[in-house]
């Protein structure tokens, strides 16, 4: 399938991408140009991106950094907390023939095959900022499709107001699920239905021009760029529509530290980290955190 890139007012120019090697490992911070080869991307339609809205809001541009660094530093709590090592453990996750169960307040519960979804929806590239609650920030080029396209197909009932997402429960593979058995596994997250239908909310199946590797949440994950990264659940196996706020992993363990909305906000300290500033790979000085991670023009109307 040809790669389709739909220009939007929130898009970043390519030179702001944090190469994959920094995103995952964040140890060396080198400024280079990220290059997509025809062999890596296949048959693509390349379109120059327009001005990125967050830049107008005062977010300074991020230099390119090599993809090789970003492939070795990541958060995937199911596989442990050693960010520079868990990518190895994540390779045990078998992602072939992956399915997603759909239930709750939906007209017809069903089982979705991810490979079919990838063929069904036009593939887009979305270059998004990703802001971790640990106060670091990167820029990632995702491949996938808007979540709203899937929601429209699933036909939720009028009473549905929220969407709950769940990941796998495989304690023999994801050892944190076994070693920290008292925690409320599997990992879950949720959005309001309005948030889930927003054009920015994305289901990613690829990154840096290739399919998602296991440590990034293969074969399909959520990306919600104006919220802290823990909202962007990885390796989704279930989607439920509900009429009540779903109980999610971190909020169920520590509701005073992790609120359900989890919108990026520089004036609200979050969990164990102050949020006024953020670390950006490749820069020595911290940057000021921007409300909604630079996407205020697009999402602020949802939070009066």
Residue ranges and their predicted role:
Residues 3-4, 22-23, 28, 34-35, ...:
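A broad "ordered helical/assembly scaffold" signature
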Residues 52-304:
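Structured, non-membrane catalytic/scaffold regions adjacent to prosthetic-group chemistry
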Residues 1-28, 49-52:
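N-terminal secretory signal peptides
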């Amino acid at each position: 399938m040809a790669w389709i890139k739909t220009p939007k007012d929130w898009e970043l120019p390519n030179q702001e991408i944090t190469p994959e090697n920094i995103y995952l490992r964040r140890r060396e911070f080198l400024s280079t140009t990220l290059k997509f080869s025809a062999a890596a991307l296949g048959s693509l339609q390349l379109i120059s991106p327009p001005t990125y809205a967050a830049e107008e809001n005062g977010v300074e541009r991020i230099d390119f950094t090599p993809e090789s660094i970003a492939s070795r530093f990541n958060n995937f709590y199911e596989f442990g907390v050693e960010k520079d090592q868990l990518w190895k453990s994540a390779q045990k996750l078998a992602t072939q023939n992956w399915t997603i169960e759909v239930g709750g307040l939906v007209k017809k519960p069903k089982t979705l095959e991810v490979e079919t979804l990838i063929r069904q929806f036009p593939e887009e590239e979305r270059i998004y900022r990703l802001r971790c609650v640990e106060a670091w920030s990167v820029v990632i080029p995702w491949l996938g499709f808007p979540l709203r396209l899937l929601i429209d197909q699933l036909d939720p009932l009028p009473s549905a107001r929220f969407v709950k997402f769940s990941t796998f429960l495989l304690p023999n593979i994801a050892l944190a699920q076994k070693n920290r058995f008292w925690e409320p596994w599997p990992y879950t997250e949720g959005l309001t239905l309005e948030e889930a239908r927003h054009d920015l909310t994305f289901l990613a199946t690829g990154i840096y021009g290739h399919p998602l590797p296991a440590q990034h949440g293969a074969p399909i994950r959520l990306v919600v760029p104006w919220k802290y990264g823990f909202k962007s659940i990885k390796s989704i196996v279930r989607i439920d529509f509900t009429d009540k706020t779903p109980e999610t992993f971190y909020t169920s363990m520590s509701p005073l530290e992790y609120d359900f909305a989890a919108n990026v906000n520089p004036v609200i300290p979050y969990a164990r980290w102050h949020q006024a500033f953020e670390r950006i790979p490749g820069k020595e000085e911290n940057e000021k955190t921007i409300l909604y991670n630079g996407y205020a023009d697009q999402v602020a109307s949802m939070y009066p």
